[in-house]
């Protein structure tokens, strides 16, 4: 069996282990969902028609998954039957059948599973429930505890092929949550040329995202493109900007996600959000999933203070990361993440990021270009010495440099007393200030007001981590 198939099967085995853990914990519905999805993925694997070993391995694995799914389904049925029996035992006795005394009871509703399949035998035995008045049913339920309705139609746009995503298996608020993170390639107009510096990062992203779409025949076998990358560095160095730029240049659908986007108060729904995120990324492929502050989502597992819900989300995320790296899946999904504290990442998650790149603070040339670019479109004096400003902003991040330029531009206003002006006088004064030039004195005042936001300790720790675990 070749290495590609072995690698894929290892990923499937990890997902099967997650399903077993869910089943052992009594989370049978979630285990059933994962097993069904896993069986679908295994069946869709494209393997050589002439390789009997690969066919036998896949069939054996499918039989094992099917056996586990039957056990899970039996547990779900047993739990439902027990719940129904307890409900009948604690409910009211069978009403008289005299139609003059009692109204005819309504027929029992079939109990449906999560996927719309009707349970066999449910409602065939036991007393039929009495008709419940509207007033009684409305009093028995707290409206605050009821999930919103499921009107998912029209939330998601069509993909490039004109197809619509079937989101009927998800609650509407879950679909809305993921839709809020998505920007189609027509909504993003940035370019890598807008990003100053970071030449090594641009090169790797160009090789991993743009070129495979232009010349896919080259990126085969060992040259298969990278699927996941994490950018580690101090805050304000342009990690988010470069993610948006590469998504625009490659005409990819862009998902920007934080830990709060993946959170829900409903048990099990956070995992569904993660699953839907990757399903939509594959549906709208080519796609880029950008996860900011990945350390808040993928921190070290096993900590004493870690909540069970957090572990479940991490497990689902790891499973989906492996799913998006299926070598037999031609739908291009690239996972790009950023962090300021990479040493907090879980080891299993760190392994899934094939490229781990250090993003340093901008050097003197990058700072000069950034000051010049920031001042474009703003009236300024020719006396401004950009070389001197670049030299005096050592230790500044890209965001700090932009903040310095904005402060200098605002300082034009502070050179004049506008506190006593009102109405037309204030409007006229502000209109004249639009043409006022930004001068050296404004930058001098800005340098006194703006300090570097990134501490040297953070910079050093990021560099040490990338020296130990980086992969360029």
UniProtKB/Swiss-Prot annotation:
PROSITE patterns named among the record's database cross-references: AAA
Biased composition regions of type Polar residues, renumbered to the chain: 134-143, 150-161
Result of changing residue 66 to K: In ct46sb18; gain of function
Effect of residue 225 to L: In b284; dominant negative
Result after altering residue 195 to K: In ct46sb3; dominant negative
Post-translational modification: Phosphorylated. Phosphorylation by mbk-2 is required for its rapid degradation following meiosis II. Likely dephosphorylated by the PP4 complex composed of catalytic subunit pph-4.1 and regulatory subunit ppfr-1. Polyubiquitination targets the protein for rapid degradation via the ubiquitin system at the end of meiosis. The BTB domain protein mel-26 may serve to specifically target mei-1 for ubiquitination by cul-3 containing complexes. The cul-3 protein is in turn regulated by neddylation by ned-8.
EC top class, as a word: isomerase
Sites of Phosphoserine modification: 92
Short name of any one Pfam family annotated for the protein: AAA_lid_3
rRNA-binding found in the keyword field: no
Spans annotated as Disordered: 83-161
Assigned GO CC terms: centrosome; chromatin; cytoplasm; katanin complex; meiotic spindle; meiotic spindle pole; microtubule; nucleus
Effect of residue 36 to C: In ct46ct99; loss of function. Does not affect mei-1 degradation. Prevents mei-1 degradation during the transition from meiosis to mitosis
Signal peptide: none
Positions annotated to bind ATP: 233-240, 351-352
Annotated compartments: Cytoplasm, Cytoskeleton, Spindle pole; Chromosome; Cytoplasm
Catalysis: reaction(s): n ATP + n H2O + a microtubule = n ADP + n phosphate + (n+1) alpha/beta tubulin heterodimers
Classification via Gene3D superfamilies: 1.10.8.60, P-loop containing nucleotide triphosphate hydrolases
Family membership noted in the UniProt record: Belongs to the AAA ATPase family. Katanin p60 subunit A1 subfamily.
Function according to Swiss-Prot or TrEMBL: Catalytic subunit of a complex which severs microtubules in an ATP-dependent manner. Microtubule severing may promote rapid reorganization of cellular microtubule arrays. Required specifically for meiotic spindle formation in the female germline; the presence of this protein is inimical to the formation of mitotic spindles. In body wall muscles, regulates organization of myosin thick filaments.
Protein name in UniProt: Meiotic spindle formation protein mei-1
């Amino acid at each position: 069996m070749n290495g590609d198939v072995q690698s894929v099967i290892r990923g499937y085995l990890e997902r099967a282990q997650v399903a077993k853990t869910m089943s052992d914990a009594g989370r049978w519905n979630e285990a059933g969902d994962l097993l069904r999805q896993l069986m679908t993925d295994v069946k869709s694997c494209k393997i050589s028609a002439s390789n009997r070993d690969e066919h036998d391995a896949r069939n054996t694995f499918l039989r094992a998954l099917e056996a586990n799914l039957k056990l899970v389904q039996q547990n779900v049925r047993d739990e439902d039957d027990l719940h129904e029996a307890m409900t009948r035992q604690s409910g009211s006795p069978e009403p008289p059948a005299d139609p003059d005394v009692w109204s005819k009871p309504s027929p029992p509703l079939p109990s449906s599973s999560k996927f719309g399949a009707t349970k066999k035998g449910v409602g065939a035995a036991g007393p039929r429930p009495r008709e419940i008045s509207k007033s009684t049913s409305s009093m028995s339920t707290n409206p605050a505890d009821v999930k919103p309705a499921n009107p998912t139609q029209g939330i998601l746009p069509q993909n490039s092929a004109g197809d619509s995503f079937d989101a009927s298996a998800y609650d509407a608020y879950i679909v809305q949550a993921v839709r809020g993170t998505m920007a189609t390639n027509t909504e993003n107009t940035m370019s890598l040329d807008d990003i100053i510096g970071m030449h090594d990062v641009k090169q790797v992203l160009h090789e991993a995202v743009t070129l495979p779409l232009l010349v896919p025949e080259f990126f085969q076998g060992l040259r298969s493109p990278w699927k996941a990358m994490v950018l580690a560095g101090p805050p304000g160095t342009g990690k988010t900007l470069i993610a948006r730029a590469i998504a625009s240049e490659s005409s990819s659908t862009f998902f920007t996600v934080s830990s709060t986007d993946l959170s829900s108060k409903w048990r099990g729904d956070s995992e569904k959000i993660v699953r839907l995120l990757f399903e939509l990324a594959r549906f709208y492929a080519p796609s880029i999933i950008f996860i900011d502050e990945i350390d808040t989502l993928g921190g070290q597992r096993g900590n004493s203070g870690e909540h069970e819900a957090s572990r479940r989300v991490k497990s689902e995320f790891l499973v989906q990361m492996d799913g998006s790296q299926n070598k037999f899946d031609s739908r291009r999904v690239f996972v790009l993440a950023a962090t300021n504290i990479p040493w907090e990442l879980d080891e299993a998650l760190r392994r899934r990021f094939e490229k781990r790149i250090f993003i340093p603070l901008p050097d003197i040339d990058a700072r000069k270009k950034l000051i010049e670019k920031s001042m474009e479109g703003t009236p300024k004096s020719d006396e401004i010495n950009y070389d001197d400003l670049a030299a005096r902003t050592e230790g500044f991040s890209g965001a700090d440099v932009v903040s310095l330029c904005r402060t200098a531009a605002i300082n034009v206003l502070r050179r004049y007393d506008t506190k006593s002006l009102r109405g037309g006088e204030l409007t006229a004064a502000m209109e004249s200030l639009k043409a006022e030039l930004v001068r050296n004195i404004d930058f001098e005042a800005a340098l006194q007001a703006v300090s570097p936001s990134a501490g040297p300790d953070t910079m050093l720790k990021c560099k040490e981590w990338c020296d130990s675990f980086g992969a360029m």
